[in-house]
């Protein structure tokens, strides 16, 4: 088993390889159906199966703050919000693109992983706490909100909310 060390803590090497979404797909496939978006997969081959890809590396007019002017059944996003200066604004915008009953499925780096904190990783501008994400969805009147408090082997957590 390969591991990496960062600031005296040992982590599984898989956390340094990218493509975190693969660990969320088995759960997401049980929940997400219909027409959807994958926001921020970084590569086409890393996108949620069947979803329309929204990413700055895709040459089109869309990004996390400028989505197609249509409604979707779900939005999947893995390890994207921590890269955005205004994650609240992004989620507010994403919510406007969901059908009634639509689902936002987030897979996010857990704050306990030292390397993913913004002061240790220049690509991350936020460290998102599970309770903050849960509070956001609850305050925005999502009907069903599920957020894991702990982390998985990829040191990530899930947040799933339905309008």
Language model: regions and residue ranges:
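Conserved N-terminal segment of class I S-adenosyl-L-methionine
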Residues: 1-70, 74, 89-91, 123-126, ...
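S-adenosyl-L-methionine-dependent methyltransferase catalytic module, highlighting the catalytic core
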Residues: 14-15, 26, 30-31, 85-163
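Short loop/turn segments at strand-loop or loop-helix junctions that form parts
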Residues: 56-57, 78, 107-111
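A short beta-strand submotif of the Rossmann-like class I SAM-dependent methyltransferase core
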Residues: 74-80
